[in-house]
Amino acid sequence: MKNKLLTAGLIILVLGISLASVLLQTNYALALSSRSAEVAFLSRLSGMFIVGLLFCQIVLLGSYKKIKVFFTALTLILILIHPLLTVYQTKLIYGRLDPFYPFTDMCVLCPLRDQIITLGRLAFWAYIAAIAAVVLKATPWFKENWQKVHALVYVAFFFGVAHMFLIGSDARTPLYLYFFTILTGVVIIKAVRKLRS
């Protein structure tokens, strides 16, 4: 019971700091000034929650299977919504609709901002592959290899964190920066231990 309460408290803390970081950085007069600004606010909020939820899945929910499935579903929904909000915002600003842009437009030899956006895309596809490994683990090849493929959740977390810190202003608030630097360190330690075992 004590472990469950501690885990629940840590989850509330992680997600609460994610929410507080966005709310503290938001100029509400600007955020509510246009449909595009409202969509940008929702995109920022979903991005912060995605990283918080990924941390909870990796570090806190290992032994709580039912809750982990719920968090995985919630993370997957947000991971799909986050780039779709970008599609909608692009439609509002530029008047063009390209639903495949946030999922496929990878760029290595391009301006820095586009490279940072590509990190988000790589995080998206790594997470999708990690979830697919769990879903398909009953098939012959995945029966033996699903855990190796599922380890891509760590890749998704690190690419997501890099994407968030390099492109998002919300991640630069002192409270969030210090807190999530510690959390990222915890995930690094867990990833190294997993690689050694």
Can you say where each PLM-predicted feature lies in the sequence?
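Membrane-embedded alpha-helical bundles that constitute the cytochrome b-like, heme-associated redox core
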Residues: 1-197
